[in-house]
């Protein structure tokens, strides 16, 4: 293999992995249980945590940007097989955009430590940031109080997201130990 071919392969690998994780995000988003609030329970947060934990700040955040942009141009990657700017402009849009913030926080911390508990802490911070951004967005669009927004969009999801954090941290730790994903 000549040097030029090796360089192209090395450059392409992270982008391919980002594409794979963006596809994982879509599949995780499709597995959803609708709620009366309009914010469904789905596995998207698990996808965000896995991509950021495995890929770090740069590529974890890039993966979420790709995912959001694919949805914005109309591909049905969001919950309920939806896509388009109307989804981002709607009540759940803040949570979807918040995935980028979550990935940035988790990826930044995860790439700087090998500690399982630091990874769990990073994931908790990332999910809280996503909750904050998404809930502020929801409260603004729905013209409700922040307390009502928390009651509708955060509190019902806490047990599910705690499970997702635990599962993601365990999977990321295991993937790190096996060196399956190298960037």
Model regions and ranges:
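Hydrophobic transmembrane alpha-helices
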Residues: 2-61
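Membrane-embedded alpha-helical hairpins and interfacial helices in multi-pass inner-membrane proteins
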Residues: 37, 81, 114-183
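Membrane-helix interface segments
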Residues: 11-13, 57-62, 112-118, 145-146
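Generic alpha-helical transmembrane segments of integral inner-membrane proteins
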Residues: 19, 23, 27, 50, ...
